[in-house]
């Protein structure tokens, strides 16, 4: 995720560190979705990610920084969705088909915990 650099305390250099950051973000999205941002703790996020809480703190100073990284992930997914929808072959569909395609894409986006929790917080 290219915008992630702005939300990380330390930039992961190795592939396994990048994978750990993704695991932390995936776990945080699940935990925030299940219990809410307010009720979530960095310890439960680390446990869900199957990593030590110290590893989490290497990359994120607190759960707000994790949430901010999830916001960036969501924004990138929305951008990708719009790029798909505004291809000429989609725009030229009959209106009903275009709306169906749009609704389907938005449903798929919000099936992901990241998008649900970002939306709920606002």
What are these regions (language model features)?
Residues 1-19:
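N-terminal intrinsically disordered/low-complexity leader segments
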Residues 23, 31-65:
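Helix-turn-helix
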């Amino acid at each position: 995720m290219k915008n992630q650099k702005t939300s990380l305390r330390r930039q992961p250099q190795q592939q396994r560190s990048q994978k750990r950051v993704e695991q932390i973000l995936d776990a945080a999205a699940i935990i925030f979705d299940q219990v809410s941002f307010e009720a979530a703790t960095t310890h439960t996020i680390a446990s869900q990610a199957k990593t030590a809480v110290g590893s989490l703190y290497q990359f994120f100073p607190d759960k707000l920084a994790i949430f901010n990284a999830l916001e960036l992930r969501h924004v990138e997914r929305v951008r990708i969705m719009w790029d798909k929808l505004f291809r000429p072959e989609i725009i030229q569909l009959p209106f009903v088909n275009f709306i169906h395609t749009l609704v389907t894409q938005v449903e798929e986006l919000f099936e992901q915990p990241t998008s649900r929790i970002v939306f709920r917080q606002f």
